[in-house]
Amino acid sequence: MTAALPARATIRDVGPRDGLQPEEPVAVADRIRLVDALTGAGLRRVEVAAFVSPKAVPAMAGGAEVVTGIARAADVTYAALVPNRRGAEMALEAGVDELTVTVSASEAYNQRNVRMSTDESVAVVGEVAALAADAGVPVDAVVSCAFGSPYEGEIAPAEVAALADRLAEAGATALTYADTTGMATPRRVAEVVDALSTVDVGLHLHDTRGTALVNAYAALELGVTRFDTAVGGLGGSPFAHGAGGNLATEELVALLDDLGVHTGIDVEALADAALLVEELVGREVPSGVAHAGPRHRRAPSD
């Protein structure tokens, strides 16, 4: 190890939203089961829904029912993705604790994803942030394609940092860099994070090329302590060709446990939640820890 690691890390599981979004629709009652399983395992930040058009994203229909149906815990932050002011109004009315918004560092990706320019999306963030501020709710701005675009290749770290500054000026209270395309490497993580004036940034990592876990370790060495992950490693953007799922929550927690970085999350219960995801989507999830368990698990004696 080349640097002291943080004593603690915070994980936001985005599985109920980002993980299930590209799947065939899962019943609201089952999505509620998943959220409750995650908080039961110790997660204290969960992205539970997206308030988007159900015609455009059928898997996210019924977001308000999910938010109102979960077993709310006072010490858990329940977040929802919103694409615009109307989505923010619906999410706040449902009672979410945090709003997440996305703007891409790639102009081409932003056009394909939300049919707006980056400038237009920054303006939307300002509208959402103003509404959220009136309600006393924080807004996390997620910069997608922060480590590269499938249409434009690598994006200069200074450009990514400039967009982050604009989002903060627009009213975002937190910032997350997303490796939407799975193009990040430890080198790119260092370059992009170092370009910021502060390391108070979260990372949302995808495992398209099998580098998500090593990228998380590299980020820890840089002082990053906030991570977005998805139980079971599900997810992936339809606008990023060949994009893999998110870094599996249970795999990151298993690593952090071994490194002595506290999360407050029970990795065994989390592995069980990943198997619940398999039941809900009807296929095997791409997570080694979900199937083999953490490294300390012992085989049955018989």
Indicate where each model-derived feature is located.
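Catalytic cores and adjacent flexible loops of soluble metabolic enzymes
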Residues: M1-D302
